[in-house]
Each structure stands twice: as C-alpha cells, then as structure tokens.
UniProtKB/Swiss-Prot annotation:
Its main location: cytoplasm. The gene is prs. This is Ribose-phosphate pyrophosphokinase. Binds 2 Mg(2+) ions per subunit. Its cofactor is Mg(2+). Keywords: ATP-binding, Cytoplasm, Kinase, Magnesium, Metal-binding, Nucleotide biosynthesis, Nucleotide-binding, Transferase.
C-alpha cells in the first residue's frame, strides 16, 4: 500500500506542515507536503500546478474554507480537480473549518441553503471523502453523497480543562452560550463531571443581543463557556459579563473555531474573560497569537492520526475517546 500523501492550499499552511510532521512521528518515516504551486493570475483566477507524480496515490488536501471563504473554497475545488485529472486514486478533503456551515437551513423565505450547495461542489470536484472538525450543524454530513468524518474538539478540550484546572474541577460549571449549543456543552460537562448552565439570549437582529438570562446557579463557580464558533466575539463577551453579574468568580471560554473577525480580538482582550482557548483549525493571525488571554490548542496530532486511520482502514471514531488522545498528544496532557 502506498503511503498517504498530503497537499495544501494557502488557507492554513502552518497546520498542514504540522500534520505532516506529526504523521512522520506516528509512521516513523518522513512525510512532507506534495510540491505544488497554488497561485493567482492578475485577474485573481486561481491556478494550481502539481509538480510530483500522484497517479494512483491516496491524497489528502488540507484546506480550511475560512476567511477569505470563497477564495479558499475555490482553491480546494481546483486542487481536487488537478489531482483527479492527474489520476490520483482517492482524494480526501481535510477541512478543519468548514465555511458556510452556518447556512445549513432556510432561516427565512427566499434564502439559500449554502452548506448544501458547497457540499454539491465538493462532490462534483471529484473529492471522495471529507474529514472535518466540529461541524456547526451535524446534519450537514447528510448533505454529502460521500463519507464524512466529523471529528470533535470535546475530547481534547476535556483533557485541556483537566490539565489547566487540576485540583479545581469541583469548582467548575460548564456553560452553553445559547440553547442550541446545549448538546455540545453537555458533552464536555459529562467528560469532566461538571454541572451545566445555559445563557438564554434573545436576539433582535443578527449581531445584536437584546437580552441574556442565565439558567442555572453560577454563583461562586469558575465558568467554562463552550461553543463551536467565535466570530466577532460580541455574544461571547456579553455572556461572560452576565455570568460575572450572576456571581461567577471566573469565566473562561473553549471555542473550536476562532474566526475572530473585525473587533473580536480587542473585545476579548478587554473582556472579563480570563482566557479564551481556541484550536488552530483557522490560521491564527498575529493579533490572535499576541493576545494575552487567548491560547491555542493544536489539532495536528488529532488530524494526523485521523488521516492515518482513514488510510489504513481503521476506526476514526476511536478518536472521540479522551483516553485515545493522551498518547497522541505525547505527554502534553497526563490523566490522574
């Protein structure tokens, strides 16, 4: 069986290189990115040229479709087309952050279901499988006519919480920032054996919060807000304020995808939150890396193992278990 081969667009080269390094550690052999050129013509058309022979190879395209979402999506599709026309045997799109996932349904009349359209485009480009992380809506997996492996941040976040709050777990309260995110927050609460609270928000219009109410007693607790996406951070920072007003002694947040657009970083640094923990599913900007209360949990170990499991035909769902991730993260976290 040929070794898996990785190729990357421009969306998150740092993560792609980290995945290659981690796979090298796991496999005991050198894994590097396939040599390719992904460029723009003067009119901003995307051009891809693969410099290595990929005929009959098992290819993994690492490309989150984050900001600029349209450019990064087109890069993914064109890379896949180049690989298919170069006779690659199988193409897996590794999409750490799946853009357009928030458009998974018609919220009002005469609007699109853009997530379904993107799924159709991915399939038509010749991609055989998708590997992603914390889809905004789990039902998006059903939009595809190809297999989709959706990894979860909950196991590694639970490990991180156990590590950073060692000896304080009894003081923690996991908080969902809205009713729709309860299942996600409950999963982490169950893993760390903590109670659950909910912030019920009433939204007047997108981007504007009219009212927030805390469901649950957070007095004297160190609150851990759990969500999948932080965009402008307005809702998150307001939720942190409301929790403090309701008696919480500290507020920390664990968010899978740090979109952090516009004034988000400034809001977070000035907020009452002691820390915001995100993954590197989206390439962190210099401002994000320099923020004193933002910390980044790497996803490369998890993606590297998932790719190896797909390649070898072994279980990907084994990565949903916290204990499985301990050796994968190589001493970064210790249990007990």
């Amino acid at each position: 069986m040929n070794e898996p081969k990785l190729i990357s667009g421009n969306a998150n080269l740092t993560l792609a290189k980290s995945i290659a390094r981690r796979m090298s550690v796991h496999r005991g052999m050198a894994v590097s990115l396939v040599d390719a050129r992904v460029e723009r013509f003067n009119d901003q058309e995307i051009f891809v040229e693969v410099y290595e022979n990929v005929r009959g190879e098992d290819m993994y395209v690492i490309q989150p479709t984050s900001n600029p979402a349209n450019d990064n999506l087109m890069e993914l599709l064109i890379i896949a087309d180049a690989l298919r026309r170069s006779s690659a045997d199988r193409i897996t799109a590794v999409i750490p952050y799946f853009g357009y996932a928030r458009q998974d349904r018609r919220a009002k009349a005469r609007t699109p279901i853009s997530a379904k359209l993107v799924a159709n485009l991915i399939v038509e480009a010749g991609i055989d499988r998708v590997l992603t992380l914390d889809l905004h809506a789990a039902q998006i997996q059903g939009f595809f006519d190809i297999p989709v492996d959706n990894l979860y941040s909950a196991p590694v976040f639970a490990l991180d919480i156990e590590h950073h709050f060692k000896g304080q777990l009894q003081d923690l309260m996991v908080v969902s920032p809205d009713v729709g995110g309860v299942a996600r927050a409950r999963e982490i609460a169950k893993r760390i054996n903590a109670p659950l609270a909910i912030v019920d928000k009433r939204r007047e219009k997108p981007g504007e919060i009219a009212e927030m109410t805390v469901i649950g007693n957070v007095a004297g607790k160190k609150c851990i807000i759990v969500d999948d996406i932080c965009d402008t951070a307005g809702t998150l920072c307001k939720a942190a304020e409301v929790l403090i007003e309701n008696g919480a002694v500290e507020v920390h947040s664990y968010i899978t995808h740090g979109v952090l657009s516009g004034p988000a970083v400034e809001r977070v640094t000035k907020s009452v939150m002691k820390s915001l923990v995100i993954t590197d599913s989206i390439e962190p900007s210099a401002a994000v890396r320099g923020a004193p209360n933002i910390r980044i949990v790497p996803t490369a170990p998890m993606f590297a193992q998932a790719i190896l499991n797909i390649w070898s035909g072994t279980s990907v769902s084994s990565l949903f278990e916290t204990d499985t991730l301990v050796p994968i993260y190589e001493g970064m976290y210790q249990r007990g």
